[in-house]
Amino acid sequence: MPTAVLIDGGYFIKRFRRIEPHNAYNAQRAAEVAHRWAIAHLKHASGERRDLYRIFFYDCPPLRKKMHNPISGLCIDYSRSDEALFRTSLHEALKQKRKVALRLGHLTDFSSWTTGSRTFDDLLKGKRTFGDLQADELQPNVRQKGVDMRIGIDISSLALKRQVRQIILMAGDADFVPAAKLARREGVDFVLDPMWSSIPKGLMEHIDGVRSTCPRPLEQQRAHRGQLPCAIPGTTSAT
């Protein structure tokens, strides 16, 4: 049964950095485990191995603009940032992997700045004023565009063209639900891999199962062994 694995790159990178924080900017390692964890889905619980159709990795090129920080006035070249170098190297490494297709969206072309949610809360509650903000508390306000659309189109295309019998999606939100419904109506087995993160309430009714093939983040490993008094997001085995 041909299986396609679709990976939301932004989500994957966040979870990868929770699982292997010491490799946060190791692009080669990120590409290696993305491929490995995707391939791990091909092994059936009974020992049967499915055929791989393709691995799709969705992301955006990194921010490469030069921007002036509105507080310090310093010109920052974001093309030389750790994040930009990591993303560029990751994309190149993925292109070299067998049966991996890189799908790139784009970033919004706005030259605005923002700050963290906690800082916003403090500003709204009057605990701080805008005059208190420091230069290092600001970051460019950029958003991905076209990634969710590409995921939805590919899910629909794979299902309608009968190219696969199973779709594995590594993601963590409910944006894909309409496409998942279509795929299931076409007889496709739709499995979500949230990489051991909790999933939105009510999502289970729109998918055929949940399975994570990556290691648990360290704090979840401890909780799973009963060392921490916190709940572990439940997962449903998928075959």
Task: Enumerate the language-model features and the residues they cover.
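Domain-level signal for Mg2+-assisted phosphodiester chemistry and nucleotide/NA-binding surfaces
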Residues: M1-D122, A135-D136, P140, D189, ...
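Nuclease catalytic cores that cleave nucleic-acid phosphodiester bonds
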Residues: L104-T239
